[in-house]
């Protein structure tokens, strides 16, 4: 099976290989003129930016290719085979050539657990060592919240990492969305939570002035986008009087949650739930109840966390803009916000139905739990994005709802 689709006669990506020399004056304390190598903009104007998503059939084939180009992965795989080969051969001799089922399950689990972690660690290590170049590309191309803006940055960094032997392929970022996500995880969030200059220098070293300029450029582009949502109102709902909240359709919220849990998105969690029941069948009633209850609570937790991760940055901006501009106050205000966002997220195909929020109470909880709570703690959490660029607007939304007079 061919993994990579050819783009030209030489089966090479159309990313230009020629570089040009350009000097950029950096602003900051004690920062002098420094030269960087960036890909010629004229080439990008005449040719389409090509990323791995245009060359590979899908994300899986790209990752499969990257894994087998990774020296760490090949070394780990060899050690794993050497570790289990003697046991495998002895099992074959002792049980009449029947493949040991438990050994197969164990090896599969080890691969599933360690392989993504190895790849993620390698990616993060490369980015951590290339913060200055990452920042320079952002300053040069000024990307905003639109994922399309990050295509040139991703293509440039893919070529730069390969040419400077920081990565062993030209396909470091699969697409622009991965580059945008890396910016948030490696630059925006870690740098923003640092409280003083000394801690920034300790963590980021000589890259601090470049990161500061990159974040300033991104902040400017983000503010332009926010004005579209908050002043020009790029979207306004129609016929809201015919929209009903799920609380009027379902008798209980529990029924609404169950419907969301038992859909295709959470099918793996449902399989895990059934596996818990099967494993605990002969372990006693108490153990069985604990396993079943734990599996169900896990599925509820996954459902709650799935909602914010399904929203893009533009959707979150629309959510905050809707809160700030809502005229109704109190519980009625949150009901109206829930109606508008249910319609918006359905029209934008973020959610499959107009049932994203159960009611106004659920909408208010969602805002407090996934937005305002992070503004209060300003600490990264594994199940919630920090939304650093939204902090000023989260605070404004909270103050708006607090200042609203009761009905």
Swiss-Prot record:
GO annotations of cellular component type: endosome; membrane
Protein localization: Membrane
Keyword Heme in record: no
Top-level lineage group: Eukaryota
GO biological process assignments: protein transport to vacuole involved in ubiquitin-dependent protein catabolic process via the multivesicular body sorting pathway
Pfam families named in the record: DUP
InterPro entries: DUP/COS
Membrane topology, record value: Multi-pass membrane protein
Annotated family: Belongs to the DUP/COS family.
Name the record gives this protein: Protein COS9
Lineage, uppermost ranks: Eukaryota, Fungi, Dikarya, Ascomycota, Saccharomycotina
């Amino acid at each position: 099976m061919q993994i990579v689709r050819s783009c030209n006669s030489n089966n090479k990506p159309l990313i230009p290989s020629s570089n040009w020399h350009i000097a950029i004056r950096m602003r900051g304390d004690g920062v002098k003129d420094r030269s960087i190598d960036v890909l010629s903009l004229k080439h990008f104007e005449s040719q389409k930016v090509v990323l791995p998503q245009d060359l590979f059939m899908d994300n899986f084939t790209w990752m499969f290719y990257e894994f087998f180009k990774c020296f760490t992965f090949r070394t780990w795989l060899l050690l794993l085979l050497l570790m289990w080969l003697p046991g495998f051969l002895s099992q074959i001799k002792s049980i009449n050539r029947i493949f040991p089922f438990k050994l197969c399950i164990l090896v599969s689990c080890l691969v599933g657990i360690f392989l993504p972690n190895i790849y993620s660690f390698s990616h993060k290590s490369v980015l951590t060592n290339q913060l200055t170049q990452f920042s320079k590309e952002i300053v040069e191309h000024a990307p905003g919240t639109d994922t399309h803006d990050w295509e040139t940055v991703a293509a440039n960094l893919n070529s730069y990492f390969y040419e400077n032997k920081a990565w062993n392929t030209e396909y470091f970022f699969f697409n622009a969305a991965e580059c945008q996500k890396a910016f948030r995880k490696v630059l925006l969030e870690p740098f923003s939570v640092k409280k003083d200059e000394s801690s920034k220098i300790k963590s980021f070293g000589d890259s601090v002035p470049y990161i500061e300029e990159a974040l300033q450029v991104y902040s400017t582009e983000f503010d332009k986008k926010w004005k579209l949502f908050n002043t020009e109102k790029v979207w306004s709902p129609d016929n809201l009087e015919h929209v009903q909240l799920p609380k009027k359709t379902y008798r209980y919220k529990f029924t609404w949650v169950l419907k969301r849990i038992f859909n295709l998105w959470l099918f793996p969690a449902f399989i895990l739930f059934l596996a818990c029941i099967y494993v605990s069948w002969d372990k006693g009633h108490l153990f069985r109840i604990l396993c079943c209850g734990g599996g169900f609570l896990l599925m509820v937790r996954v459902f709650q966390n799935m909602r914010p991760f399904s929203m893009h940055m533009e959707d979150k901006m629309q959510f905050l803009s809707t809160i700030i501009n809502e005229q109704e106050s109190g519980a009625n205000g949150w009901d109206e916000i829930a109606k508008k966002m249910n319609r918006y997220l359905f029209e934008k195909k973020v959610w499959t139905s107009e049932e994203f929020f159960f009611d106004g109470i659920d909408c208010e909880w969602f805002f407090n739990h996934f937005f305002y709570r992070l503004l209060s703690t300003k600490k990264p959490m594994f199940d919630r994005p920090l939304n650093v660029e939204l902090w000023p607007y989260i605070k404004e939304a909270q103050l708006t709802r607090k200042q609203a007079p009761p009905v």
